[in-house]
Amino acid sequence: MPNASTPILIVDDEEIVLLAIAESLIPEGYRIVRTTSPFDALEILKREEFAVIISDHHMPGMTGLEFFSQAQHIQPRASRILITGVLTLKVVVDAINKGEIFRFIAKPWIREELLATVKNAIHRFELVSKNAILEEQTRETNSSLRQTCDELAKQNAILTKQLSEREMTFE
């Protein structure tokens, strides 16, 4: 569930868009970090974990897809939402293949759609994070079980040898 500690990064070269998105999300209790530069955003991602990253597609110096492609390597669990005024088939295909975009939002967006998309993106982030924890616990449990199995196999070999030796003494 969203709360004050749910961090969202917003990247758009237009301050007015950053402000509009933030004004929609802040009343819902999200903690917003915003920047007009995708390059600055990449540096921010190296310092702080985000549940959701929202980015414009058309920005000077780097497209939203290029940004998401790099952001994915820094924070693979974060849900990525692309906001764009022009949605072409090429953008959609590239977004899926290169940036693993969670959702698209068209400009101008509908506030309720934005809020629902962000809520779903946070839910996805939480599931992916829990899954990563469960995978690590499974690896640790499997390692422990392998170690126990190896120890039991050694003890079994010792007991089998002792049993064979006793059977020989009775013959």
Locate each region found by the language model.
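C-terminal output helix
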Residues: 87-91, 109-118, 122, 126
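Acidic catalytic/metal-coordinating carboxylates
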Residues: 6, 36-37, 63-66
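Non-catalytic signal-transmission and effector/linker regions of two-component phosphorelay proteins
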Residues: 1-9
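Acidic, metal-coordinating helix/loop segments flanking the phosphotransfer/catalytic sites
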Residues: 34-52
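Active-site residues of response regulator receiver
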Residues: 56, 84
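Two-component/phosphorelay signaling modules centered on CheY-like receiver
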Residues: 6, 15-33
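Receiver (REC) domain active-site loop signature in two-component systems and cognate sites
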Residues: 59
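Amphipathic alpha-helical coiled-coil "transmission" helices that mediate dimerization
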Residues: 126-171
